[in-house]
């Protein structure tokens, strides 16, 4: 199994189509299996229909997403987890440090 690349939402457009990604985002909207996540001024649309039966989504909730980027820029979600209580500054620092090592 291929590992997911840990990124920020604003880096999704720079990733290859089909690439497996992992990122954190705040729920801006959710309707009919389509999720809009934001982080600062960046946003991404995610299709959660594959995991839909197992998903409970609340507006403004922070979510940890693993999915594949489609050609149209939407991310097909493979795994979704709540990130309630996450220390955002520490998380951002950890992602930046990890990216420097990759």
From Swiss-Prot:
<keyword id="KW-0539">Nucleus</keyword>
<dbReference type="GO" id="GO:1990879">
    <property type="term" value="C:CST complex"/>
</dbReference>
<keyword id="KW-0158">Chromosome</keyword>
<dbReference type="GO" id="GO:0016233">
    <property type="term" value="P:telomere capping"/>
</dbReference>
<comment type="subunit">
    <text>Interacts with stn1.</text>
</comment>
<dbReference type="GO" id="GO:0000782">
    <property type="term" value="C:telomere cap complex"/>
</dbReference>
<dbReference type="GO" id="GO:0043047">
    <property type="term" value="F:single-stranded telomeric DNA binding"/>
</dbReference>
<keyword id="KW-0779">Telomere</keyword>
<dbReference type="InterPro" id="IPR024222">
    <property type="entry name" value="Ten1_fungal"/>
</dbReference>
<protein>
    <recommendedName>
        <fullName>Protein ten1</fullName>
    </recommendedName>
</protein>
<comment type="function">
    <text>Required for telomere maintenance.</text>
</comment>
<dbReference type="GO" id="GO:0140445">
    <property type="term" value="C:chromosome, telomeric repeat region"/>
</dbReference>
<dbReference type="InterPro" id="IPR012340">
    <property type="entry name" value="NA-bd_OB-fold"/>
</dbReference>
<dbReference type="Pfam" id="PF12658">
    <property type="entry name" value="Ten1"/>
</dbReference>
């Amino acid at each position: 199994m291929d590992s997911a690349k840990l990124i920020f939402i604003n880096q999704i457009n720079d990733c290859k189509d089909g690439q497996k990604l992992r990122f954190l985002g705040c729920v801006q909207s959710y309707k009919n299996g389509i999720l809009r996540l934001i982080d600062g001024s960046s946003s991404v649309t995610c299709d959660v229909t594959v995991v839909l039966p197992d998903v409970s989504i609340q507006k403004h909730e922070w979510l940890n997403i693993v999915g594949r980027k489609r050609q149209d820029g939407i991310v097909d979600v493979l795994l979704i987890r709540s990130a309630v209580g996450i220390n955002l500054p520490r998380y951002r620092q950890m992602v930046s440090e990890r990216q420097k090592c990759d």
